[in-house]
């Protein structure tokens, strides 16, 4: 809501906190989900150097908890046979592989999918793109699949 106002966007409608989407939308509503979670923004420090000043170590744990809750919440909205792309603009493993790995260890209907095209360095559960000398941002992504029942 704040970002929509800041960007002067009138087409954005906030329905609820993403952690409550499973309460508002029907289960298995989506074939695919892009979950671009709030994060520390450590991958975009090149463009937003204030991140170095405003971020605290304790913020990372708060973001990680929120990321886990969001992933758990939206998983119920994914149809069997569906795919979920988990993404951050972070280069920190605590917000990336640690979140996906923890989720996979507790959610027996989830598995990592092989990405058809890979950009960045392979990690245990996804791909990490580091900020580039060519001017690109850092980011992480992992493709998760839900098998047909």
Where are these regions (language model features)?
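S-adenosylmethionine
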Residues: 1-149
């Amino acid at each position: 809501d704040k970002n929509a106002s800041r960007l002067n966007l009138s087409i954005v409608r906030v329905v609820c906190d993403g952690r409550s989407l499973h309460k508002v939308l029907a289960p298995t509503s989506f074939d695919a989900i892009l979950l671009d979670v709030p994060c520390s923004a450590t991958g975009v420090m090149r463009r937003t150097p204030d991140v170095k000043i405003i971020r605290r170590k304790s913020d990372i744990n708060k973001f990680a908890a929120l990321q886990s809750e969001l992933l758990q919440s939206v998983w119920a909205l994914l149809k069997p046979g569906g795919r979920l792309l988990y993404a951050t603009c972070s280069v920190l493993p605590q917000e990336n592989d640690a979140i996906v790995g923890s989720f996979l260890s507790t959610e027996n209907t989830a598995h990592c999918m092989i990405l058809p095209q890979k950009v960045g360095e392979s990690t245990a559960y996804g791909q990490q793109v580091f900020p580039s000398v060519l001017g690109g941002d850092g980011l992480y992504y992992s493709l998760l699949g839900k098998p047909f029942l």
